[in-house]
């Protein structure tokens, strides 16, 4: 069953990514190249980073998808450990805020919606960061509100706008019922 999915459904480059991630094959100049360069970029950033637009791995094009899938390694090289922690902290605050909005909802739809948006954001953050540091196979999932790409930004913005609107209507409803 797994063989059928692996050989029939997945494309050859997807199979190579999975095999490379599992350590079955090693291709430092092919399948593993992006992840290896990403790890080098993040590691070379150190604690405070090299400075804005001063990252050598990024500046000289060693990381091919530095503005999309591997944006986190750009932050790691230019802003270091501190910069990556700030980005992760802000994304965590956003996720926690969405969960808090969900707790305030009086209708099941609003609660489920806010929790689902928080779960989607958490999934994207975990997969993207895991991908750039080599803990997950490369999947092409953007880092919310940071990766280049209009459709991702528009989709996440719409998800957040709906959640904020649901929260605002819940607050308005509770204010009207107090008086």
Regions found by a protein language model. Name each.
Residues 1-81, 108-110:
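Hydrophobic, glycine- and aromatic-enriched re-entrant/interface helices and adjoining loop segments
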Residues 1-7, 12, 101-106, 163-177:
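Alpha-helical transmembrane bundle and helix-membrane interface signal
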Residues 13, 90-100, 121, 130, ...:
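Transmembrane alpha-helix boundary/anchor motif
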Residues 74-77, 117-121, 149-152:
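Transmembrane helix-bundle signature of multi-pass membrane transporters/permeases
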Residues 78-95, 113-114, 154:
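Hydrophobic alpha-helical transmembrane segments
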Residues 99-140, 146:
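Loop-to-helix entry and N-terminal half of a specific, functionally important transmembrane alpha helix
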Residues 127-179:
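A juxtamembrane structural motif centered on a specific transmembrane helix
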């Amino acid at each position: 069953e797994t063989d059928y999915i692996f050989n029939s459904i997945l494309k050859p480059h997807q199979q190579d990514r999975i095999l490379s991630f599992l350590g079955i094959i090693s291709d430092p100049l092919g399948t593993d190249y992006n992840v290896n360069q990403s790890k080098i970029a993040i590691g070379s950033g150190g604690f405070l980073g090299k400075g804005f637009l001063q990252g050598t791995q990024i500046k000289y094009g060693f990381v091919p998808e530095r503005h999309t899938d591997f944006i986190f390694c750009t932050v790691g090289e230019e802003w270091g450990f501190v910069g990556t922690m700030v980005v992760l902290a802000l994304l965590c605050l956003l996720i926690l805020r969405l969960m808090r909005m969900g707790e305030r909802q009086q209708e099941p739809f609003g609660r489920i919606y806010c929790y689902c948006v928080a779960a989607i954001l958490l999934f994207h953050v975990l997969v993207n960061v895991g991908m750039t540091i080599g803990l997950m196979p490369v999947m092409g999932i953007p880092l919310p509100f940071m990766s280049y790409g209009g459709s991702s930004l528009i989709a996440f913005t719409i998800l957040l706008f709906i959640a904020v609107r649901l929260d605002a209507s819940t607050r308005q409803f509770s204010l009207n019922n107090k008086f």
